[in-house]
Amino acid sequence: MADDWHFSNVPLMNGEEYTVRQLVDSMMLVSADGSTEALALADAGSTAAFNKKMMAFAKKAGVTDIKIYNMIGLPNGDLGKHKLKGVDKDAENLLSAKDVALISKYLVENYPETLDITKQKFANFD
């Protein structure tokens, strides 16, 4: 995923080391799927474990009626070796605009440093 230009506008090279901040910046500033996947898997260990953590986070934000299939929001089949087994290849995350707003509000209120990242006008990903 991280080296496929279809999914990652900030390619990650196998064998290279990246800081968490580099991955977070590329994830939050330019929506780099490879960085998102790397962070989620490093934190949770698997797509299924990440989904459980994301559902718990959403619940804290007051959101309970959503479906999370992966950390990126792509169809399940696009995740290659990280796709969920036994789940349709076309399954995608399902949440409303209100759900996204509630999760975003919770994120900013509880992790205000998020704004320091998202207010950057540019970042170097070399």
Regions found by a protein language model. Give the residues of each.
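Short, glycine/proline-biased beta-turn/loop segments that scaffold the active-site neighborhood
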Residues: 1-13, 118-126
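Conserved catalytic neighborhood of penicillin-recognizing serine enzymes
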Residues: 4-40
